[in-house]
Structures are given as C-alpha cells and as structure tokens.
Amino acid sequence: MRSVFLCVLCVLCGEISLAADLLPLGKLPPGKVVLVLQPHHDDHTTDYGMGGLIARFVDEGYDAYYVRASNDEKDGSHGYARNDMINLSESIAATKILGMKKVISLNWRNDYTGPIPLNELRAQLILLIRKYHPDVVLGHDPWEHYQKNPDHRNVARAMAEAYWLAGYANVNPEHLKIGLQPHTVWYLYGKARLDWGLGHRPNIDIELNDSEVKKKELAYQTHRNVYASPGSARAMKVALARENLYVPEWEGLSDQDAAVEMEEWFMEWISRQRGALAGVKYAEDYYFLDEFDYLPGLKDYLRQNLVKLP
C-alpha cells in the first residue's frame, strides 16, 4: 500500500522538514463552546485539517458548531446546484461523526469571497460569535503567507477580525436590537498548510488519541463527492500503470473501497507525522493565541509580576 504514496510522500516530507523542531504539547483551554469558522464543507477534516482537535474538544465536553461560509457549488462534478446539496449533506454527516452540534451555512458563492466586502462577512461572523458565545474559535491561520485558496485567505482574515471585534459594543451595534450582546473570545487556533511554502508557523501541537484520529478518518471519508470517490482510485491506478506499478492490496476491491483505503492510510499517516514532531503517537499542529497574547510583552510582564492569592 505504501508504494501508492511515494509521490505524495516526496512532497509532504518537504512539509515535515520545514517543521523539524519539536513543538510543545498544548493543553485544551477551559470552556464549553468551540466555533469552527471555515470557508468550505470539508475544511474540518482535510489532510492538513482540524478534525482531530474538534473530536478532542467534544471528548472533553465542548459543544462544537461548524460554519461553512460558501455554498461549495464548484466542489464536485455534478453541476453547481447538485454539488451544493451533496456537499452540505456530506458536511452534516461528517460533522456528526466528530460530535458537532450543527452546520451553519452562510451560502456565499464558492470561490467568490474576494468581491464580498470584508466587513459584511465579518459582521456575519461577529453575529454568530455573539449568538453562540464560543470560548474558542478555530479556523485557518489568518496570518499564513502561502495560502493559495482565496476563500481560505478571505474567510480567515474575516475570522481574525471578528474574533477580535466581537467583544466591542460599538462594533455592529445593530446586533443589540435582536438581543445579541458583545462577546469576547479568549482563545484562537489557526491551521496552516506548510506544504505550500514556509510561512506563518505553528507554535503548539495538540495530542490526539486513537479514537480521535479514527473519527477524523471517518469524517474525511464521508466527503466522497470530492475525496474518497471511485474516480480518485481509478486515476491513481492509471498513473501507476504508466510506471508499470500496482497496489496488491487493491486486488479484488472496488474503486470506491480502494479510495477509502487510500484515504484511511493517509489520514493516519499525517496524524502520526505531526505526532512525531512533538514526541507523541498522533497530533495536529496549530498557531495558538490565548487571553494573554493581545499586547506585546504582556506575558513577560505577568511572568515577572504575578503573585498567587493566598
């Protein structure tokens, strides 16, 4: 089976080497609600994604909500309207595997977040923050420098601003008329793709257990419109045949089952690679901000001056 991924490994080994230094293991912060703000239906459990951390939040008692900003109409081969319906259905099924409570769709046009006024998208995210009162916001790293996907860039930027501004009463004061009060979010986790370039770096790893990795794998497989589809296995077989290669484990399997096996292997592999960077079995890496990261030097000041109450 591993021969299938030689070409993938050649690319990803470069990614792993970019982060060769061990990262510290982070503990989950205190809280009850995590709001996952993403552009697309599948960004929670892509190969570089956050499904393991979401599953761990749920395991530790958090309520988790998923926001997809776009309608995902371009993701798949069934035409815009049907792609939208299939991808929403698969997103609901996948997030249930992770234990999430709800999928909230903003339904902006897929691959069209550039023309959207940033303050309009930001206002929607602020409204959701004020409605669901998250302790933690999770999404793409808004400060990563090598993000090719425009929806990822734009939604991440809106997320970063909403995370900061949702606590200010003078920002979107119209929300008060529908009973939504300002709400401060203390913790932010940002996820970046390091295989696209050496950009903004993660500063912690979050350890995952076997069950959380398995949930991530199952959620990833659920997105068969774009990931674990028969077409991906057929394309791989054609590419290997050109090199006079094949995968013995695929003999007797349908293209669908072969695709699922391939995705299972890769999701376990990437979680293991991340774990190796922190000296544990499985992990995911993130750029993390906590309640003391707002001002430069604040942590050093607190470290020098804090005293425990008697």
Give residue spans per PLM region.
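Active-site rim/loop-helix segments in enzyme catalytic domains that contact anionic ligands
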Residues: L18-K131, E161, Y168
